[in-house]
């Protein structure tokens, strides 16, 4: 008897693992963990997250734009990053109110649960302050998805700032998406935290400076004040332990060259100094992977940016 029960349980787990179909009401709805509704502004590229249910692997995210007379489905996504999160790589630039919900599905995208409770967020424009950046500004880590408050430095910046960052971006990619992603929000001040991916992958300091100068020129042409942040350092030992790509070239020289240029611009925040150890590397106690500052590091960045904005743009904070 016990053997039959064991084999039946093993078969049930196997069916779920390989996407087999079971009753749509087999699982309870997922509990959502992203916290967009508690942020000053919804991120341009939201990362939806939820608490994964045992014996499940696949999830569907649906995003709906709330209409005056009729709601409209604007996203139907299926997770490919992990069991508990999914980043939306299509930017939310259209103002309005939205809600999102999640349900369990099988490999064939057939529902295995009801929809979760709805969570709402609002897209507004124009904004006074915004940040253009990469994963350090987008938020998130291996252990905490980007949509949670504790994994974004913007949470610790007590000046409300719109998050226009996108994980993985180089300065060229930010330049390429500037018109589509920045201009709809018409920020008065744009914080630019960019360049770490460039130097990590071997770009020269001059190449990064060229792109930053182009970003500056785009800002000025659109009556936006650019505020550059110094490029944070990296910890090569931790980076290699985590299997993250890192150039064999002299990334420190490139980073220092770019930071010297940044510190000669009219408006800049030195967020890197406090995060750097005596050897010039990102402090090991502030990073889980050698590239991304963890909670304490994000608190430092958020505090420094807020102090700078309040000191230099007091009439706008």
Predicted region positions:
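Solvent-exposed loop/turn segments flanking beta-strands in beta-repeat/beta-sandwich domains
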Residues: 53-70
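Histidine-centered active-site loop/cap adjacent to the catalytic His
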Residues: 100, 174, 266-267, 283-317
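Substrate-gating cap/lid alpha-helix
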Residues: 236-272
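Beta-strand-rich modules
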Residues: 92-108
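Serine-esterase "nucleophile elbow" of acetyl-processing enzymes
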Residues: 107-167, 172, 177-186
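Conserved aromatic anchor
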Residues: 44-56
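Signal that preferentially marks extracellular ectodomain short beta-strand elements
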Residues: 82-95
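Short, compositionally biased P/S/T/A/G/V-rich stretches that sit at domain boundaries
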Residues: 20-47
């Amino acid at each position: 008897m016990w053997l039959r029960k064991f084999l039946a349980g093993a078969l049930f787990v196997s069916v779920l693992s390989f996407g087999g179909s079971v009753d749509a009401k087999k699982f309870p709805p997922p509990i959502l963990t992203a916290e967009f509704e508690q942020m000053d502004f919804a991120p341009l590229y939201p990362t939806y997250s939820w608490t994964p249910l045992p014996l499940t692997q696949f999830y569907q995210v649906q995003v709906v734009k709330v209409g005056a007379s009729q709601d409209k489905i604007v996203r139907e996504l299926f997770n490919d990053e992990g069991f508990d999160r999914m980043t939306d790589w299509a930017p939310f630039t259209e103002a309005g109110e939205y809600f999102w919900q999640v349900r369990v599905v099988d490999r064939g995208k057939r529902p295995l649960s009801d929809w979760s409770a709805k969570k709402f967020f609002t897209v507004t424009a124009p904004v006074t302050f915004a940040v253009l950046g990469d994963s350090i500004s987008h938020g998130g880590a291996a252990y905490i998805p980007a949509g949670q408050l504790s994994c974004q430095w913007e949470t610790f910046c007590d000046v409300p700032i719109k998050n226009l960052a996108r994980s993985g971006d180089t300065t060229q990619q930010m330049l390429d998406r500037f018109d589509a992603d920045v201009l709809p929000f018409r920020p008065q001040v744009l914080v630019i935290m960019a360049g770490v991916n460039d130097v990590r992958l071997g770009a020269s300091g001059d190449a990064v400076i060229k792109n930053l100068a182009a970003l500056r020129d785009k800002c000025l042409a659109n009556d936006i004040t650019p505020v550059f942040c110094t490029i944070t350092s990296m910890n090569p030992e931790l980076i290699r332990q985590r299997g993250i790509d890192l150039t064999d070239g002299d990334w420190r020289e490139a980073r220092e060259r770019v930071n010297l240029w940044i510190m000669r611009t009219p408006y800049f925040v030195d967020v890197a100094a406090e995060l750097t150890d005596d050897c010039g590397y990102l402090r090991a106690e502030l990073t889980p992977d050698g590239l991304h500052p963890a909670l304490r590091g994000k608190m430092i960045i958020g505090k420094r940016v807020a102090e700078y904005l309040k000191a230099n743009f007091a009439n706008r904070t």
